[in-house]
């Protein structure tokens, strides 16, 4: 699954833009927030419980000794196959509810004698069979025991069938159920999505099963290791199209008794996990092609989006990416077709359902007239991510969610390889450094981080499972796999990977199985020699949290490692069998020339002539940041690197010019180097035109903005940045002939975006005038947008920040009319840039109304408002006032809660804010925090670290910016 909370290159820069002109006292307001008018009458999303016969067990009556009161399924039964028929109703019934009806037959084998059948079920209302919620029969000559009673256990989400005698080991049985569920708009399980086609509201039925919501669609053994085959049949309105993981067995046939309905039966799936199931009923249309291996490729979307060719780019890159992965894995694509569909309402970024991949519209659709280059990059990388899963995750699947990083980290790494193959001139692989490596280090430097592989007993509940879908699993997983591939070499890595996939096809694995096959590849060749086994090296990166800071003393050649912590005074309570020491691959250059590779072999320190520098020499480690660690040097070597950057920066690779900035700012945050050293590392940027170093500076200085944009430091800081950015702003003004052309190179395009956003956000008059002029031109002729798609996020934000209600209302109206979600995203984020409190307050209230802000966009809208210095306190008050409602509407397992908490607390740096955060935690213990539980603990830790850092550095930073303005 792609990350659900996506920020494009341009939109990410809005974090710098928001609140630029608002360093004034913020007026506290008492706000009455509009309440959402729930289409389903706020009945929750559960259908009524069965009226007679069975019982419903609540949390207050649980007996923990009973297996149905535990979150993990017993291993007494294993499913073989399912036959599932579902009928979604796309108009509301007399009670105003959208529902679906269904029936299911699950065939399973008894592995150990048991007198109870425990199967997952969530928010389903069952039709009784002879007074029970299910019917049981034996297969062949097997006699099934009689059912004693049935019950629904709400807390653990089970349908429990108690038997009068035991099932026999080795025997096969079938259990039948008939049920009804709500086709809610909650983005989970079998749900409905709505969109407008002109003035007509359209409704479709779609799915999102990962991680624990297949059970909301039909009763099933809903764990990844409980693989089975599936026969899916959909009964649907005859004028709509039905899709599922497999192709239809044949044409749809009329439904008996109602000629307005059709029946579509699909081919049997391969053995697969429940979370990869998908089925959709809609009037969507497609564009299609056939890959060289006869795999049918189709891109589905709203009919107008298809007619406008918004799916063509996705179609054009899908075939090459599928071919790339088939070669990369040395394994053919396992299915006869590859459908991909863009959904108007979707909680995640995308989902790798086998053969029917679902996407947010902004991750699949592209319009060259209104989409930016970063939108295009988003499409190709997300497609590559999801198609990578068709083998790694779908064909071979994790045994349990505690190893989620193996699925998502791997896909997050190879997405860059697949996208690079489809777009070879873009240098996409380099973007992993800012997008993943350094972004995740900010979280992994906290004592509240967690290892990649979390102990299985810590991951049981749906909320705990959802917590695993975090930046550690995705970005740290990708970073350490990239490091592994680098020190093995890509060819050797691919050999081990192919062996792993071929050995465990249609099975479940743990990370240890991958290490074993990579080790076999190492042992079958002679050129690559490792200091220890693959497992011994990698266990230190996967079984303990965090990462090392490598410190080099070039006077003595001493090299040492230490667990890097954002707050060095914090206490690490999670023990590590490796004592937070790593086996570290070290690459280095001396005076720009490569040196031989070196391993720091799990010891705290060592000494080597590689790292000893003469008076005129400088040494730099971690070339192209292929290792997952940061580097510190003695003061003299830092000065030599700074001098090199000022005089002949080309002797340092571009990625390492960015690394010098990232590492030094992180080290300064952790009190390991003076903050002035980090700031001095930005002086060379006045002559730098490359994207990566500037992105490192923009990203690193954003922390300074968050800490100081409510203080007297911010004015001198803006003056410094205005002076630094002016040369690159003028460079791109000239290169693009006064912003009328687009730079040819993708990285130059991103550098141009950075230049304009940094210039405008720090008050460069030429940039502010550019934004105002372009936006006014658009307002004067709304049918013709003169702003290049690459620049729209920046121009929209700055124009709205400079303007008032007229500009805001114009942008809001354009948002309502936007036909492409990429354009809507830009406008929705820019609306948070206003400096008018009442407009921000009104905008916040819109997030509670899904008719104004879609549920999938509510979290990112609130966090955009919180990024604005004026909106931050409003957003925080809003979250505190509405936490219970938000939690009930989105559910404790929503991926959005961690992003929400992170977004509204990023600026916290005072004792008062810490007190408020602690009170928020205490006051909502009864409601809970769901998938945001760890994020809340991390917010508390970050706030404490921020308080200490500001106290220590405020005066020093103020004086530095004054001296360099």
UniProtKB/Swiss-Prot annotation:
Annotated region described as Disordered, given as residue ranges: 40-65
The protein's enzyme class: hydrolase
- Name assigned to this protein: Aminopeptidase N
Please report the organism this UniProt entry assigns to the protein. Answer: Bos taurus
Membrane side Extracellular: which residues? 33-965
- Looking at the UniProt record, the site noted as Transition state stabilizer sits at 474
Q: Which InterPro entries match?
A: Aminopeptidase_N-like_N, Aminopeptidase_N-like_N_sf, ERAP1-like_C_dom, M1_APN-typ, Peptidase_M1, Peptidase_M1_aminopeptidases, Peptidase_M1_dom, Peptidase_M4/M1_CTD_sf
Similarity field = Belongs to the peptidase M1 family.
Gene Ontology biological process terms, A to Z: angiogenesis; cell differentiation; peptide catabolic process; proteolysis
Q: How is it modified after translation?
A: Sulfated. N- and O-glycosylated.
Residue spans with biased composition (Low complexity)? 44-61
Traced from the root, the source organism's taxonomic lineage reads:
Eukaryota, Metazoa, Chordata, Craniata, Vertebrata
**Which compartments does it reside in?**
Cell membrane
Q: Give the intrachain disulfide bonds.
A: 760-767, 797-833
Q: One Pfam family of this protein, by short name?
A: Peptidase_M1_N
């Amino acid at each position: 699954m792609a990350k659900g909370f996506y920020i494009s290159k341009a939109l990410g820069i809005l974090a710098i833009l928001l609140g630029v002109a608002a360093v004034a006292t913020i007026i506290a307001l008492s706000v009455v927030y509009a309440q959402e008018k729930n289409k389903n009458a706020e009945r929750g999303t559960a259908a009524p419980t069965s009226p007679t016969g069975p019982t419903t067990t609540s949390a207050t009556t649980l007996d923990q000794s009973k297996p149905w009161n535990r979150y993990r399924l017993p291993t007494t039964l294993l499913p073989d196959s399912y036959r599932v028929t579902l009928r979604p109703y796309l108009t509301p019934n007399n009670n105003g509810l959208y529902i679906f009806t269904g029936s299911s037959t699950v065939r399973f084998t008894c592995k150990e004698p048991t007198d109870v059948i425990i199967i997952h079920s969530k928010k389903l209302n069952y039709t009784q069979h002879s007074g029970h919620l299910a019917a049981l029969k034996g297969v062949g000559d097997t006699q099934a025991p009689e059912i004693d009673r049935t019950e629904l256990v709400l807390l653990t989400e089970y349908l429990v069938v108690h038997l009068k005698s035991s099932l026999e080991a080795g025997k096969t049985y079938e259990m039948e159920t008939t049920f009804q569920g709500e086709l809610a708009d909650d983005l989970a399980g079998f749900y409905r999505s709505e969109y407008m086609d002109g003035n007509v509201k359209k409704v479709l039925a779609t799915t999102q099963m990962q991680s624990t919501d297949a059970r909301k669609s039909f009763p099933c053994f809903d764990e990844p290791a409980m693989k089975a085959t599936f026969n899916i049949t959909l009964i649907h309105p005859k004028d709509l199209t039905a899709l599922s993981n497999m192709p239809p067995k044949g044409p749809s046939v009329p439904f008996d008794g109602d000629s307005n309905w059709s029946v579509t039966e699909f081919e049997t799936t391969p053995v697969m996990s429940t979370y990869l199931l998908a089925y959709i009923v809609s009037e969507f249309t497609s564009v299609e092609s056939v890959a060289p291996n006869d795999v049918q490729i189709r891109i589905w979307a709203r009919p107008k989006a298809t007619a406008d060719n918004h799916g063509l780019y996705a179609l054009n890159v899908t075939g090459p990416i599928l071919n790339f992965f088939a070669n990369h894995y040395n394994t053919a694509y396992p299915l006869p077709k590859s459908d991909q569909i863009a959904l108007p309402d979707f909680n995640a970024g995308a989902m790798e359902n086998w053969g029917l991949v679902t996407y947010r519209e902004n991750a699949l659709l592209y319009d060259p007239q209104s989409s930016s280059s970063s939108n295009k990059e988003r499409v190709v990388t997300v497609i590559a991510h999801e198609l990578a899963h068709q083998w790694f995750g779908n064909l071979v699947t994790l045994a349990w969610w505690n190893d989620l990083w193996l699925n998502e980290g791997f896909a997050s790494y190879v997405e860059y390889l697949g996208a690079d193959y489809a777009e070879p001139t873009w240098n996409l692989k380099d973007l992993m450094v800012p997008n993943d490596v350094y972004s995740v280090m900010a979280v992994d430097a906290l004592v509240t981080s967690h290892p990649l592989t979390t102990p299985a007993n810590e991951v049981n509940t749906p909320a705990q499972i959802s917590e695993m879908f975090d930046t550690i699993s995705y970005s740290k997983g990708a970073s350490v796999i990239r490091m592994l591939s680098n020190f093995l070499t890509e060819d050797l890595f691919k050999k081990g990977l192919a062996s792993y996939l071929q050995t465990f096809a249609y099975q479940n694995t743990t990370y240890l199985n991958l290490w074993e096959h990579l080790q076999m590849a190492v042992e079958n060749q002679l050129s690559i020699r490792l200091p220890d086994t693959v497992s011994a090296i990698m266990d230190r990166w996967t079984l303990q949290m965090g990462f090392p800071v490598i410190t080099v003393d070039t006077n003595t050649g001493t090299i040492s490692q230490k667990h890097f912590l954002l707050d060095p005074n914090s206490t690490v309570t999670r023990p590590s069998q490796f004592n937070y020491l790593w086996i570290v691959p070290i690459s280095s250059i001396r005076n720009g020339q490569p040196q031989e590779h070196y391993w720091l072999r799990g010891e705290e320190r060592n000494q080597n002539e590689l790292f000893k520098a003469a008076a005129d020499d400088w040494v730099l480690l971690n070339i192209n940041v292929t290792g997952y660690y940061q580097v510190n040097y003695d003061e003299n070597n830092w000065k030599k690197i700074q001098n090199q950057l000022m005089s002949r920066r080309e002797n340092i690779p571009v990625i390492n010019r960015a690394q010098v900035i990232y590492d030094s700012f992180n080290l300064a945050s952790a009190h390991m180097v003076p903050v002035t050293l980090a700031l001095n590392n930005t002086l060379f940027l006045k002559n730098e035109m490359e994207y990566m170093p500037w992105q490192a500076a923009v990203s690193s200085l954003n922390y300074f903005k968050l800490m100081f944009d409510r203080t007297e430091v911010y004015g001198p800081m803006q003056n410094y940045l205005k002076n630094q950015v002016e040369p690159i702003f003028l460079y791109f003004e000239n290169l693009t002939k006064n912003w009328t052309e687009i730079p040819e190179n993708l990285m130059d395009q991103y550098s141009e975006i950075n230049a304009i956003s940094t210039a405008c956000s720090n008050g460069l008059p030429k940039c502010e005038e550019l934004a105002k002029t372009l936006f006014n031109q658009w307002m004067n002729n709304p049918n013709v947008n003169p702003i290049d798609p690459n620049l729209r996020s920046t121009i929209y934000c700055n124009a709205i920040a400079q303007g008032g209600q007229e500009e805001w209302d114009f942008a809001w109206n354009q948002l309502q009319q936007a036909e492409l979600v990429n354009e809507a995203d830009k406008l929705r984020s820019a609306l948070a840039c206003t400096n008018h409190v009442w407009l921000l307050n009104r905008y916040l209230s819109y997030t509670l109304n899904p008719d104004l802000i879609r549920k999938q966009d509510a979290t990112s809208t609130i966090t955009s408002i919180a990024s604005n210095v004026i909106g931050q306190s409003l957003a925080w008050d809003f979250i505190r006032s509405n936490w219970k409602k938000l939690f009930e509407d989105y559910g404790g397992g929503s991926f959005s809660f961690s992003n929400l908490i992170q977004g509204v607390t990023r600026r916290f740096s005072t004792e008062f804010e810490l007190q408020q955060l602690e009170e928020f935690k205490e006051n909502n213990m009864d409601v809970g925090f769901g998938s945001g539980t760890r994020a809340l603990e991390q917010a508390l830790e970050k706030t404490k670290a921020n308080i200490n850092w500001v106290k220590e550095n405020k005066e020093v930073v103020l004086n530095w910016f004054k001296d360099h303005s």
